[in-house]
């Protein structure tokens, strides 16, 4: 019989696993190796573009890679997108010390070398269920992005397409070719 002890978000926050990416899925710890160079470069480039746009237009707050968001409780789920954005009207007056108990408006996932399609789809479903309005899954190997919206619609963007912030990140546009 396997160990069925579930971890809480508070326990995850205190966990010390340097050089690892951690998330909590329904109380179960998931530990992964860091993303590679391409993953990091694409996530940073897109995060920088989003941050510059958000600051220029005072749209809200951008969170860096591996910021955990507690999106389910009992058992806890803590997910950490590569980039996250929350709109200005949702920015808390006092930033939580631990994991925020709310979902961002935009979650960006840049696929890493060890990401599996079924796990990525599960993560997208969890983000949308938690209230994320727009999810971008960027695949640097295939040079594509998939856009998932809260209304259930989705789109596959090829290498020549442009990411659009729609009503979530108004005015933001980033050609995918700029990410590679």
Segments predicted by a language model, with ranges:
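Gly/Pro/Ser/Thr-rich low-complexity, intrinsically disordered segments predominantly at protein N-termini
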Residues: 1-180
